[in-house]
């Protein structure tokens, strides 16, 4: 199993980790864009090393399972609806740039912008689908292009379909970003360990170390958990 972010990774999160913002269209709660696949890997490595997490890009199979609504799927053409305007920012909206994340209706799993807004990098190299049934395929071992899913603000409704896929080399485009995933086995193991020791306190701090008594939505904090065995864990979270 796996976990996947409800939102596309925002410029706020990217800048908090990397210290700079590569996006062509600035906006804290807009998805980070103009990032290549390789740049995303650098971000994920720094995020994991800094905050002791295990994030990664979703595989293409995981991404499609999620965009279709997972085990709650109702078989929609787009992610969460048969009416594209309900769930996707796309070319008919006559937009000049991507929109802040979470502005449309989520899909059956509560995931936003799986159709439209920006294309999303997945982990896989691009390759033709196998003609044989497969369970959680991982794509080719090597290639020249990586897969993009989801469509973008520049594309027609055809690109918003849950089955639509394309690919490009690892280059930067202002219509391409990503969302984070995490393997459930790792997350479950951590949760199991955490539950075996009594938690004494949970506090949120801003990135410059100031205690946040009333955390605000869509802001980044360091979550500090202190337990009775004296251990302290710190993780970056978007509240």
Task: Spell out what each predicted region is.
Residues 7, 55, 110, 202-203:
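A residue-level detector for well-ordered beta-strand positions
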Residues 1-22, 115-116:
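A short glycine-rich, aromatic-capped structural motif
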Residues 112-115, 205, 226:
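Hydrophobic alpha-helical segments, especially N-terminal targeting/anchoring helices
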Residues 182-212:
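Residue-level detector of functionally pivotal "anchor" positions at catalytic/ligand-binding pockets or at interdomain
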Residues 104-107, 197-200, 217-219:
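Short, small/polar residue-rich loop motifs at catalytic or cofactor-binding pockets
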């Amino acid at each position: 199993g796996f976990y996947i972010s409800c939102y596309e990774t925002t410029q706020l999160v990217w800048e908090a980790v990397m210290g700079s913002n590569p996006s062509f269209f600035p906006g804290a709660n807009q998805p980070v864009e103009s990032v290549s696949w390789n740049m995303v890997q650098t971000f994920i490595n720094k995020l994991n090393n800094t905050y002791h997490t295990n994030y990664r890009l979703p595989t293409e199979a995981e991404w499609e399972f999620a965009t279709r609504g997972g085990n709650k799927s109702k078989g929609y053409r787009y992610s969460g609806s048969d009416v594209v305007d309900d769930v996707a920012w796309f070319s008919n909206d006559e937009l000049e740039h991507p929109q802040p994340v979470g502005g449309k209706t989520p899909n059956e799993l509560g995931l936003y912008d799986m159709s439209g807004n920006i294309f999303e990098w997945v982990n896989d190299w691009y390759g033709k689908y196998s003609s044989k049934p497969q369970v959680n395929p991982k794509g080719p071992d090597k290639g020249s292009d990586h897969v993009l899913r989801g469509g973008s603000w520049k594309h027609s409704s055809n690109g918003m379909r849950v089955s639509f896929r394309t690919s490009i080399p690892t280059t930067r485009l202002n219509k391409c970003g990503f969302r984070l995933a995490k393997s459930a086995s790792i997350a479950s193991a951590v949760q199991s360990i955490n539950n075996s020791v009594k938690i004494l306190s949970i506090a949120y701090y801003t990135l410059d170390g100031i205690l946040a008594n009333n955390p605000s939505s869509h802001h980044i904090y360091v979550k500090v958990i202190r337990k009775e065995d004296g251990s302290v864990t710190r993780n970056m979270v978007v509240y």
